Amino acid sequence: INRQKWLKEVLQALPKGIRILDAGACELKNRKYCKHLKYVSQDFCQYQGEKEVGSDSLQLENWDISHIDIVSDITAIPEPDASFDAILCSEVLEHIPEPTHALDEFYRLLKPGGNLILTAPFSSLVHMAPYHYCTGFSKYWYEHHLEARGLSIKTLTANGNWFALMRQEISRLGGIERQRKNWSWPLAYLYGLIGWFYFYMRTDKRAEDLACFGWHCVAVKKE
């Protein structure tokens, strides 16, 4: 299931009026799904979309973080214990040097019975450099680290599978070779097109156990 569609369904299903923290909220992309909630955003507000760190990394321009409620390190958010009914952290864990420390902080901030909503890439190119530290968040990562912290997994579903991931990555080939000024970039586009069609024909096959875009998780803090 598409990540944004999944997030919309999960967030809009939360009870009206509860207090939710959007950790690593960036440009508040998911706030529109939380109009019925008491929404609080947090971000460290240090990434500005600069281009100076490696031209090959994926950078984002026109970065607007002017509407963040709490500016802090995600592992030390200045809020009392058990002060949120739900916490959202979407596509952020790869930008944290020690992502398990963020899980510790989320556990502290959640009320018993509260929901922790997580998404993170299983495989991603370097982006938002230099704040990109890890990838490869498998379902086993969630199962191990959440259960170890007293968080019970409610749902854990894959976004895409290996075939869909390969289709996405091979479609980048022509653009990357052209960016690198490789004389053979037209051939790279052709090769990428052939590969795209092959993997498109295979996307109905289940292969999320090999790889996928990422896992969608809802965990509950044990009472």
Regions found by a protein language model. Name each.
Residues I1-I18, E27-K29:
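Conserved alpha-helix/loop element of class I SAM-dependent methyltransferases that forms part
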Residues V10-D22, L165-I170:
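Short, charged, low-hydrophobicity "junction" segments
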